[in-house]
Amino acid sequence: MKHSVHFGAGNIGRGFIGEILFKNGFHIDFVDVNNQIIHALNEKGKYEIEIAQKGQSRIEVTNVAGINSKEHPEQVIEAIQKTDIITTAIGPNILPFIAELLAKGIEARRVAGNTQALDVMACENMIGGSQFLYQEVKKYLSPEGLTFADNYIGFPNAAVDRIVPAQSHEDSLFVVVEPFNEWVVETKRLKNPDLRLKDVHYEEDLEPFIERKLFSVNSGHATSAYIGAHYGAKTILEALQNPNIKSRIESVLAEIRSLLIAKWNFDKKELENYHKVIIERLENPFIVDEVSRVARTPIRKLGYNERFIRPIRELKELSLSYKNLLKTVGYVFDYRDVNDEESIRLGELLAKQSVKDVVIQVTGLDDQELIEQIVEYI
């Protein structure tokens, strides 16, 4: 049986990446620091995924195990030494924390003489995630390890898309996911091109697809949350049931479409259909997606290269409309949740400093005209 190591045994890891790896015939070693999840994986050796649609079918994922990377790093290194593929779903901010362990695993492959090509795919909500991880891993590799990695270890970037809402079940491994999923991998950085996963798309140039996903799904999803919060909606479905909110989301997606078509020459009709499907996904009555989950960490989401400011910058450069995105950014600055540290911090910054200074600090912008435009909407 083929072997995989997956960092991150959370809902996305189990409910998306784990399902695909299982369907491709892999044994999966889930690596995490959550002892409850790791214990359950080792005790049961399987878990169930429910598809959030009419009929609510279930998939049983078997041949799984767990490794606590904090308690047993040596087991992770051993697993990396023999594995056929490595994936992650831990969040962009956590990637640097697994770099040293990955480097030790790569060194172990070198010492053992394992020259089977291996690809490491960071399945995160970020542009260039795998290459970012590689830069972190390189810091811990010996000169020999660097040469070995250059020859045998690939870090192809990936774009992933599946809505997995926050949830809690008596069975800690059980997870509910939406029917839709998309996983795209760039081919040019693959070291093991013969290992092709079914239900995964492979593209020579990934950047258009990553931007299509981040600027469409992430921007649209977040827009529904921040506007929804402004109007008192508690779930994304509730937000979409408000015609005013739905219309605003569609207006934001129209601006995103104009950017993607101008920049990447996407087919207009295909992109319109892609955005129609996004709206349908957000309206899924079988998913309870809390506004508070989608709207959390507003400071991060207002970043220079994030889902709002980056498309706004690029639309401005192309002299295309971004008025609806600007309005949404205003709602992001207004968002408050007592349980979200970043939203509280954002409120504190606005109370202590001028709005303009906070906009500059949070967005990293130096375009004075654009800064003033954002200030007008706060």
Curated annotation (Swiss-Prot):
Stretches that traverse the bilayer: none
Species of origin: Streptococcus pneumoniae serotype 4 (strain ATCC BAA-334 / TIGR4)
Pfam families, A to Z: Mannitol_dh, Mannitol_dh_C
Signal sequence interval, chain numbering: none
Highest taxon above the source species: Bacteria
Record's protein name: Mannitol-1-phosphate 5-dehydrogenase
Gene3D superfamilies per the UniProt record, alphabetical: N-(1-d-carboxylethyl)-l-norvaline Dehydrogenase, domain 2, NAD(P)-binding Rossmann-like Domain
Entry's Gene Ontology molecular function annotations: mannitol-1-phosphate 5-dehydrogenase activity
EC number from the UniProt entry: 1.1.1.17
GO terms, biological process: mannitol catabolic process
